[in-house]
C-alpha cells in the first residue's frame, strides 16, 4: 500500500487524484492533505479519506475548518509550515505535488529532501529551480514521476530506450480556446473566453496559461530538466484534438507517441502505480470515431508567450524563475479584470527585459528571484494584486 500526501487536494489535479485513490482503497491510504481556500471541499475530503494531517492557508481558515468538523479530527496546520509538515510526514511514501504556481516549490523540495517519491503536477518547481531539484532527486535517490499529460506521454514513449538514441521531443498543444482568433479579436478577449478550454477541464490559472500558450512554454522548460534534453531539441506542435499527448523522435527516424482520451486521471493513475497500470476511469479511445488528427506549428506572433519561455530557457540561471513570477502576477491581474489578455505576454516581456540573469545556488535564491519578478511585474502593470 502507498501512503500519500496530496499537496493541493482541492484543485483540479488533487480532486482527480482522489478519484483514482477512492477507486483503489486496497492500494492507497491518504496520510495528509493540503488546500488553500476551499474549506467545504476539504471538509468532504477529510470525511471521506480520514487523513492524519491537513493544512490550510491561514490560521483563521484552520480555526474555521476545525469548528466545522465533528467526531475525530485530523491534526490541522496552516501556512508554509503546514505544507512542509504534510510533505514530509513520516508515514508518507509518495507526495502528489499539485499546488498551482511557485508556491509549490518549497513543499515539493522538502518532500524530496525527506526521501519521498514525488508525482509532479507542479511544473513551476522545475521551471524555477530545475537544476537544484534534479540534483536533490539524484542525491536522495527518489523517483520523480511526471503527472502533466505531455510529460507522462514522453516518459512512456521513452520507456526502454537510451537517452543518446533520442533526436528530439515533441510536445503537443491543443491551441486552447483562441486557436483561430486573430490579434484584433484577442485584444478584446474576456476572462470567460479564456476559461472556455475546448478539450481539458483544468484550474483557472492553468487554463489561462493554455490560452496564452505560456503553459506549453513552461512544459518545454520542465521537459528540459525531467528528461535531460537541451531545450533546442524540444519542439511544440499544435494538435487541436488532444489525442496524441506528446511524441519522441529517435535518431533512426522512428517516432513513438502516446495516445489517449484527454483526461488527467490517466497520467495520475500511471504516476501513482508505475511501473504497473490499473483501470483509471478514462474513457477508451475509439480511433474510428475521429475525423482526423491534425498538426501544425504554433503562431508565436499571436501567442508570444511560448517564445518568451524559450528565451528564458536559453538565458537560464534566474530568468525562468523571473519569467514565471511575472506570468503569475499578469494572469492574476487578467483574471481580476485589471488588464487585457494580450497585456499578459507584454508584461512578461517587459519584466524579462529589465532582468539581468544570475546564478541561483539555493532554493532561497530562487525564491528571491521569484519575489523580484513579482514586484517588478506589479510595477510594470501598475497593479497591486
UniProtKB/Swiss-Prot annotation:
Its cofactor is Mg(2+); Mn(2+). GO terms for molecular function: 1-deoxy-D-xylulose-5-phosphate reductoisomerase activity; manganese ion binding; NADPH binding. NADPH binds at residues 10-13, 36, 38, 122, 124, 203. It is an enzyme of class 1 (oxidoreductase). SUPFAM superfamilies: 1-deoxy-D-xylulose-5-phosphate reductoisomerase, C-terminal domain, Glyceraldehyde-3-phosphate dehydrogenase-like, C-terminal domain, NAD(P)-binding Rossmann-fold domains. The keyword NADP applies. Pathway: Isoprenoid biosynthesis; isopentenyl diphosphate biosynthesis via DXP pathway; isopentenyl diphosphate from 1-deoxy-D-xylulose 5-phosphate: step 1/6. Its EC number is 1.1.1.267. GO terms for biological process: isopentenyl diphosphate biosynthetic process, methylerythritol 4-phosphate pathway involved in terpenoid biosynthetic process. InterPro entries: DXP_reductoisomerase, DXP_reductoisomerase_C, DXP_reductoisomerase_N, DXPR_C, DXPR_C_sf, NAD(P)-bd_dom_sf. Signal peptide: none annotated. Keywords: Isoprene biosynthesis, Manganese, Metal-binding, NADP, Oxidoreductase. 1-deoxy-D-xylulose 5-phosphate binds at residues 123, 149-150, 174, 197, 210, 215-216, 219. Mn(2+) binds at residues 148, 150, 219. Catalyzes the NADPH-dependent rearrangement and reduction of 1-deoxy-D-xylulose-5-phosphate (DXP) to 2-C-methyl-D-erythritol 4-phosphate (MEP). Belongs to the DXR family. This is 1-deoxy-D-xylulose 5-phosphate reductoisomerase. It comes from Citrifermentans bemidjiense (strain ATCC BAA-1014 / DSM 16622 / JCM 12645 / Bem) (Geobacter bemidjiensis). The gene is dxr.
